[in-house]
Design a protein with these regions (language model features):
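Short S/T/G/P-rich N-terminal loop/turn motif that feeds into the first structured element of a domain
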Residues: 1-52, 59-69, 92-96
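C-terminal structural segments of small proteins and small subunits
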Residues: 64-90
Length: 96
């Protein structure tokens, strides 16, 4: 069953965050992730406004978690820490 990686981000250091994004993209796609939304237009209806919103589809919740915990993604994430304020949730899709 598919799962989604949903991130809401405020970037505080664009240069460092760009390094994260470049490395993270490779790690995410290597784990079967497919970007569905990435910093496009959005409407903030409730909660905290974060200008960068990302949705990635993975083959399963386990694949999404494996990606997050992978050495490749953690190396990328080191560039995002201190360069952004982030909320990230992994959520399984409904059965078809």
């Amino acid at each position: 069953m598919a799962a989604y990686w949903i991130a809401h981000v405020t970037v505080t250091d664009p240069e460092a965050y760009a390094r994260y994004a470049g490395l993270a993209t490779g790690a995410i796609t290597a784990h079967g992730g497919k970007f569905l939304a990435r910093s496009g237009r959005y409407l903030q209806m409730e909660g905290n406004d974060r200008a960068r919103n990302v949705v990635v589809e993975f083959p399963s919740l386990e694949a999404a978690e494996e990606c997050y915990r992978s050495a490749e993604y953690q190396a990328a994430l080191a560039h995002a820490k201190g360069a952004s304020v982030r909320d990230l949730v992994l959520v399984e899709s409904l059965e078809a």
